[in-house]
Amino acid sequence: MSPIQVVVFALSRIFLLLFRLIKLIITPIQKSLGYLFGNYFDELDRKYRYKEDWYIIPYFLKSVFCYIIDVRRHRFQNWYLFIKQVQQNGDHLAISYTRPMAEKGEFQLETFTYIETYNIVLRLSHILHFDYNVQAGDYVAIDCTNKPLFVFLWLSLWNIGAIPAFLNYNTKGTPLVHSLKISNITQVFIDPDASNPIRESEEEIKNALPDVKLNYLEEQDLMHELLNSQSPEFLQQDNVRTPLGLTDFKPSMLIYTSGTTGLPKSAIMSWRKSSVGCQVFGHVLHMTNESTVFTAMPLFHSTAALLGACAILSHGGCLALSHKFSASTFWKQVYLTGATHIQYVGEVCRYLLHTPISKYEKMHKVKVAYGNGLRPDIWQDFRKRFNIEVIGEFYAATEAPFATTTFQKGDFGIGACRNYGTIIQWFLSFQQTLVRMDPNDDSVIYRNSKGFCEVAPVGEPGEMLMRIFFPKKPETSFQGYLGNAKETKSKVVRDVFRRGDAWYRCGDLLKADEYGLWYFLDRMGDTFRWKSENVSTTEVEDQLTASNKEQYAQVLVVGIKVPKYEGRAGFAVIKLTDNSLDITAKTKLLNDSLSRLNLPSYAMPLFVKFVDEIKMTDNHKILKKVYREQKLPKGLDGNDTIFWLKNYKRYEVLTAADWEAIDAQTIKL
């Protein structure tokens, strides 16, 4: 054990014992005084949020202590966490799955306990190791939809000592070949429900990567063999699964994210992140071995894989899987699985609010809805309609070293993605910060006359940075992307507050309020400049949505290029609740909204387009990049109807004559 580990180990034990002692003394006193001074303690908690701190800190210290021991014993991998839960919670459900039936809207509930899952995984490990020659250290791709088979493959690869890479099952062609190549994939295991893109790309894969094996699984036959108690099993030797040279910042899995070139990047999920990181995250969101986390998010993304599966399975609870997201059957599946927690991302909550009332939407057991991307304008509406007690909005990036969280109840902290008590805030101040941006270019971090960055003042947008604790070995905190050193290096900024320090750049703008809460504002690429001013797309979207909540089902704002003008002009894309409205009705809607907008002229959307559907990613996030490429005046195919804000006073249809005048600059924007 290194000197630093010894110090951390000792301090964690001391602080843990100290907190236990204080908690032992304070708890009965607090209960007694609570009867007399209940309102005072409530106000104190509202101001300092000490209750959640008392809940989080002892567990965090205990986890750090146990993790250091596990690292010392070379037992830091998630496989050993899984074994622990098999031993302690063998009869508890580990996985449930609402398998879609032929009849639309009907499901067959499949369940597997921890001991059943363990036995299946050992049988599948035998097949993978002896029939397919999967070896420890191999990078093996899983191309699978949401179903128990995905988790069985995942755990089997961990048992063998291989590293799973989660392919987006919609990827095909060049991006698919690129994904396999940069990750040194040896073979791919393919779910029959996800096989079409691979089959379409098979010739391209074989030409570019002839050594990569494509294994098309027959799920029904395979599951029959895995459920047979007479099938042979394989448990890898510990010293092969976890060789002495393996460190806890090495890859536990690979998850693909979108790249700036249009090709995916393979983000490294370290063992530290997927094990102790997800354990602590689960505790912060009050997961226990009695909890069930329902996710309709794809397992090939980190939200479902790390913050769903890894988090709940490390606590001995149940992972409930939906085959894919369906707004119309969401609450029925939640009810069938008995979920206590549900995951959301992007616009999922808005989709659910726009569904007809279902008898299942209040028959569930859900206490916590957690995810990222819940907008403040529907935060309380979502909670009230679906009877959700707690919102767990978090901020994280797939490749980021840490996440921020909130456990929000009541009216305080709506919209925040980081909300802790005074003690944890102080601790996190050494780990996370918001830095000021250049007033002339909000994609550039501001540096003062000494060449250092400055913390963003309260209320001012700043880029979130996360500390890299060993600047000379940044991979111990931030592992980056496999096979892409350039992109990895671009995410690290140095000499931030002193010479030699290093921080991970999140690439997002957040702001802090006077209570220490943090709020997500924009992706760095989403903010645009017009008339030499920075425009927050989130602010404009929120105001535009609020101006007509009944008619505007979904609103997107981006900046688009206008020939002969510097910067980008505001462009709003609107999906209506009623798509049958004609141009006259749409014009009236826009001008009614205009009177309710409280935006400076430079932030007003100069151009507007109505669409039947806003294009989304596979993980239900808006594809803003597509809309940033909007061509004026009629789109690429010449069929778009675009509205424009004439003289900043009234919306009208953009005609050919209007565009000629704008292009000739006889009309100024």
From Swiss-Prot:
One of its GO terms (molecular function) is very long-chain fatty acid-CoA ligase activity. A motif (FACS) lies at residues 501-551. GO terms for biological process: long-chain fatty acid import into cell; long-chain fatty acid metabolic process; protein quality control for misfolded or incompletely synthesized proteins; very long-chain fatty acid metabolic process. It is an enzyme of class 6 (ligase). It comes from Saccharomyces cerevisiae (strain ATCC 204508 / S288c). Acyl-CoA synthetase required for both the import of long chain fatty acids (LCFAs) (C14-C18) and the activation very long chain fatty acids (VLCFAs) (C20-C26) by esterification of the fatty acids into metabolically active CoA-thioesters for subsequent degradation or incorporation into phospholipids. The transport and fatty acyl-CoA synthetase activities are genetically separable and are thus independent activities. Esterifies VLCFAs in the peroxisome matrix. The VLCFAs are actively transported into peroxisomes by a PXA1-PXA2 heterodimeric transporter in the peroxisomal membrane. CDD domains: FATP_chFAT1_like. The gene is FAT1. A motif (C-terminal peroxisome targeting signal (PTS1)) lies at residues 667-669. Its EC number is 6.2.1.-. Present with 16900 molecules/cell in log phase SD medium. Belongs to the ATP-dependent AMP-binding enzyme family. It is a multi-pass membrane protein. The chain crosses the membrane at residues 6-26, 149-169. It catalyses: a very long-chain fatty acid + ATP + CoA = a very long-chain fatty acyl-CoA + AMP + diphosphate; tetracosanoate + ATP + CoA = tetracosanoyl-CoA + AMP + diphosphate. It is found in: Lipid droplet; Cell membrane; Peroxisome membrane; Peroxisome. The keyword rRNA-binding does not apply. The keyword Transmembrane applies. One of its GO terms (cellular component) is peroxisomal membrane. It comes from the Eukaryota. The lineage of its organism: Eukaryota, Fungi, Dikarya, Ascomycota, Saccharomycotina. This is Very long-chain fatty acid transport protein. Residues 27-148 are extracellular.
